[in-house]
């Protein structure tokens, strides 16, 4: 690629070596050449991107350049852009188009970003491999038989394959950082509340965060400068001043205190990833940082806590998709016919039970007939059964169970208490160190289909990322090389920091990538 990062493209634009239209055309050619194999995009807005690029070029000629003019950006398909599809990778919303722009889209468009298309993702952002999408799996651009990670796998794959300068993703339990690590890009999860969630289709509202995936720390900082800040449309956005994240990127790590959480380097971590992360830590030590071990004792409960909190919130958020107000609607006549057939079956079984003198079974069948669904309830059930995939159904059922009478205190309330303990672990650690260095994932990318039959093993892939979401902390992953046992497939290193200190993470990330 001639201009792989936006920083490169901006220099070329300023020097008159290229134009916004030429940049968009170059990426469209690459999408046409590569995306049939990768499946990173669910839709591409060729005409819209080219028209906007021409407009930005005309503005530059008039002496009115925008700060992000020339940034060709892909957007995860759970973030709303007015008039664009917003499917969330689900049959439930396969034909739905957004009626408004997310706040991040408003801010990026005003700054001159060019939206080239929507990227594929795990259904409703629920997954760690991008295999649950209604539009088919995304493939890792470095090795198509491997997963790109999830749920923002399409965004990570698009950036890694050079199909755009950068992409937006959402991170609920690692969904920006894990695919960024698997695809070899930078992935930033800002502090909860740093970036508005308005226009992000909700998965778990207390965990969801929008963040950029890029090819450099500088590009991530440039995008965060625009999308960060309080928003009156999102009551959870924080009234905290936004610094210039590009300042200090080259300051290095001298004098910083970096912590290595012992729980993140324990059993279960791939040996080569351990070695590669340790080598980077040694480099940081040589560059003037002070490195020490720290403990986050409640880390072992992170995955269980996350999957209770996230699924409980998901079961509530996804209740809105009923096929009536919006979402996939089952065929009404087929629903009525199926309902009538079921009633006839129950009547036949009831008659048989009475004929055999089985009063207990007859009473049960009679109660079922009395409680049989109305046509409207049956339509809800059929629409949701057809519209949601298996993983989404699994999480809705788990969340509904955790919130049900008799189990709320036992599971959900206890998970919230453990969540508080996890946050306190980080607060104590940051009294002694400035930032934490960890692996992003316990393993390198795995093959497509390798873990689809074992949800627990898939969930455990999030073990190093979910705690940052539970605590609301910022997290950054940067690529640190290729895994020796899976040649060509990247490994990521994660940096975690105190609330609202994204600038520190980007500074450390830039030092690692030098």
Curated annotation (Swiss-Prot):
GO CC, one annotated term: glutamyl-tRNA(Gln) amidotransferase complex
Catalysed reactions listed for this entry: L-glutamyl-tRNA(Gln) + L-glutamine + ATP + H2O = L-glutaminyl-tRNA(Gln) + L-glutamate + ADP + phosphate + H(+)
GO MF annotations in UniProt: ATP binding; glutaminyl-tRNA synthase (glutamine-hydrolyzing) activity
Keywords of this entry: ATP-binding, Ligase, Nucleotide-binding, Protein biosynthesis
Keyword Transport listed: no
Matches recorded under Pfam families: Amidase
Subunit details: Heterotrimer of A, B and C subunits.
Protein name from the UniProt record: Glutamyl-tRNA(Gln) amidotransferase subunit A
Organism ancestry: Bacteria, Pseudomonadati, Rhodothermota, Rhodothermia, Rhodothermales
